[in-house]
UniProtKB/Swiss-Prot annotation:
This is F420-dependent glucose-6-phosphate dehydrogenase. The active site is at residues 45, 114. Homodimer. GO terms for molecular function: coenzyme F420 binding; glucose-6-phosphate dehydrogenase (coenzyme F420) activity; oxidoreductase activity, acting on paired donors, with incorporation or reduction of molecular oxygen.
Amino acid sequence: MVDTHGQPLKLGYKASAEQFAPGKLADFAVQAEEQGLDSVWISDHFQPWRHVDGHAPSALVWLPWVAAKTSRVQLGTSVLTPTLRYNPAVIAQAFATLGCLAPGRAILGIGTGEALNETAVGVTFPETRERFARLREAVRLIKQLWSEERVTFEGEYYNLHDATVYDRPEQPVPIYVAAGGPGVTKYAGRAGDGYICTSGKGMDLYSETLLPALREGLEASGRTEGQIDRTIEIKLSFDEDPAQALENTRFWAPLSLTAEQKSSVHDPIEMARLADELPIEQVAKRWIVSSDPTEVAAAVQGYVDAGFTHLVFHAPGQDQSRFLTQFSADVVPLLRP
C-alpha cells in the first residue's frame, strides 16, 4: 500500500508508556522491530493517565536503551513537551546525543503539553496561546543549537549565552509537531519535518480541517506534501476475541475525556475517576475495535486516503505481545500487499 502521493506507507508501534514498566515496554519495542514494523514511539509523561497500575518512564532514558537493543526502527517521542518542565536547550542536547547513538533513527516529536505532566513538578500550566508561543520559540532555539557553533538567544521565554551543543549527529534529527487543531497544524506545515495527530475523531476533521491546514503551512514555507511525514496514531483494539477487543479499551478511557479535561486535569486519580464514569461504548468510540483483519484494513484505508503517510498503531490491551503477533500476521499483509 502506498499513500495518495506515491510514498511508501510506514507502519509503526506506539509503546504504551502509561501502562507498562520500562523493561517490559522495551521488550515490546524489540518485538515490533522483529515483526517488521518501521518505527517505535513513546510518550513522555511525568504522570500516567491512571494512578492505579499506571507507569510513566522517562522517554529520555528509555529511547537510548531501546536504540541499543534494536538496529533498524525509527525511535521517536509522541510526544514530548520541550517548553515547561524541560528547558528546550536540554532537549536539544539530549536528542542530538540520541541522533549520534542511533544515526538516522531518532525523531523528536513535540507538543504543547498537558497539566498532568507539568503541575506536579511546580510548573504553572499556561493558557493555550502561551503554550503555543513557547513551542514556536523552543523550536527556533533547538534548531539554532543544532546548526550553529555558538548560540546567544534572547527570547520571550528562553535565553542562551554562548551555548554550544558539542555532540551533533551528521544527519539532523527531524522535528515532528503534534497538533489536534488547525492553528498548530498549520505551524507544523511551516516549521516541522513531520506532523502527528491521533485517530478516532471523525474523518471530516482530518480531511476538511487538519490536513488542509497542514497544506497551508507547507505552501507558506514553499514546500509540498511530499516533503513532510504525515503521521497518525491509530487507536486499534484488535483481538481474535471480539469481547476482549472491546474490554481492552477500558484502561485507556481517559483518552475519551474532553480535550479541556485532558489538558487541564493535573491529578491521575481525578483523571481516572472521570474516565471510569464513561460507558464502555463511549470509550470504544476512539478506537477501531475489531476481530476481523479485513475490517481493520478497510478502516485504516480511510486515513491513507485522507493523506497520511505514517500509521502508528496503539493497542490498549495488557497482552501486547499477542497484539503484535496477531497484527503482524493478519493485518500487516493487508496493508502491505
